[in-house]
A protein has these predicted regions:
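NAD(P)+-binding Rossmann beta1-loop-alpha1 motif at the extreme N-terminus of oxidoreductases
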Residues: 2-65
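Conserved active-site and cofactor/substrate-binding residues in soluble primary-metabolism enzymes
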Residues: 33, 37, 61, 124-127, ...
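Short helix-capping segments at alpha-helix termini
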Residues: 46-48, 74-78, 164-173
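Rossmann-like NAD(P)-binding element
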Residues: 81-144
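Rossmann-like dinucleotide-binding core of oxidoreductases
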Residues: 144-222
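Long, compositionally biased stretches enriched for glycine and/or charged residues
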Residues: 191-323
Length: 323
């Protein structure tokens, strides 16, 4: 039996970022399908944790439309508190507490179904996120960055290396990745459809990247390797299945991985997100249950079955090799 923190000897502590004690301003960079859906989730669900949602996009007409329409939303009795939605200029973007990266240089067409489409976006999105992170550091940004674009885990590492290259004091926990929440959600979906996977919703866990290398465990108390591998495969392939049906899935990722997980992060609640796991020799942003506390990031401490730990070790080492 082992713990997930055993993957790294002498890990760098995650103690720069702590749970906020007041409402935050969350700024979204790029208002495409994912960014716009994320805005809806944060607006409707985040009023207790967020006072303002800043939005930026290359299209000023889209910014105007979203700002205007969201400001026209109210309940009859004004009984609910909604964040203010505010259009931002590029120079204003990093004036906030949380900067959310939703930009993508390209999204593969629907007829591309041969492999993980997330990795198709890596090289071009890497350039985007590096430039974005450098701009944040240069602007004196004092908050933290949330990466939602694909591939989340690798883009987190790219953003961190870019930020650290400009400011050696930049902590790795000031960048977090949001892609694992929907993989957990898909695991729950299949657990309701097939009794073989029924234990997942209450006993299971998701780990690692949200594409190749994903690790789902049917149960952490009654772990079954064969069932877990089958469930993992179904969840990994769900994206391709959707594309074969003629649509690009973005609603569940934007809400489950994005809005709900970011709100839970701000609230200090357990959430699925990718956090830095590494030392001076090797490192990766690795998805797992974690939460923000007064002293930094706490990862879930589970005594893992040997078979599950070996899968996590393989996934982690592969991420380290990729970047």
């Amino acid at each position: 039996m082992a713990y997930i923190t055993d993957l790294v000897k002498g890990p760098i502590p995650l103690n720069q970022l702590s749970k906020p004690n007041k409402k935050q301003q969350v700024n979204i960079f790029a208002m495409g399908d994912v960014g716009s859906t994320l805005l809806s989730g944060l607006f409707l669900l985040g009023g207790d944790r967020i006072h303002t949602i800043g939005i930026w996009d290359m299209n000023p007409d889209l910014i105007y439309r979203l700002e205007t329409e969201y400001r026209q939303i109210s309940t009859a009795t004004h009984s609910r508190s909604f964040p203010e939605v505010k259009g931002l200029s590029r120079d204003e973007f990093f004036r906030g507490d949380v900067a959310v990266f939703c930009a993508s240089a390209s999204v593969p067409s629907l007829d591309y179904t041969k492999e993980d489409v997330r990795m198709m976006q890596w090289n071009r999105n890497r350039t985007l996120v590096e430039e974005w992170a450098k701009r944040g550091v240069a602007s004196g940004f004092r908050g933290w960055m949330a990466i939602v674009s694909d591939p989340v885990d690798l883009l987190c590492k790219a953003a961190f290396m870019a930020a650290r290259g400009m400011d050696s004091s930049w902590g790795p926990d000031r960048i977090r990745g949001y892609g694992l929440g929907v993989m957990h959600g898909r695991g729950c979906y299949y657990s309701r459809l097939d009794p073989r996977f029924g234990s997942y919703e209450k006993e299971g866990r998701a780990f690692g990247p949200h594409g190749k290398g994903l690790v789902l465990a049917n149960s952490v108390t009654h772990y079954d390797e064969e069932v877990s591998l089958e469930l993992t495969q179904k969840v990994v392939e769900a994206n391709l299945v959707a594309r074969e049906k003629g649509y690009k899935p973005f609603i569940a990722p934007a809400i489950a991985s994005g809005a709900l997980s970011i709100i839970d992060t701000l609230a200090g609640q357990w959430n699925y997100s990718a956090v830095y796991l590494g030392n001076q020799q090797q490192s990766a942003y690795f998805g797992m249950l974690n939460r923000l506390g007064s002293k930094g990031t706490e990862v879930e401490s589970l005594n893992l079955p040997e078979g599950l730990y070996l899968r996590l070790q393989q996934s982690y080492e592969e991420l380290c090799r990729r970047y």
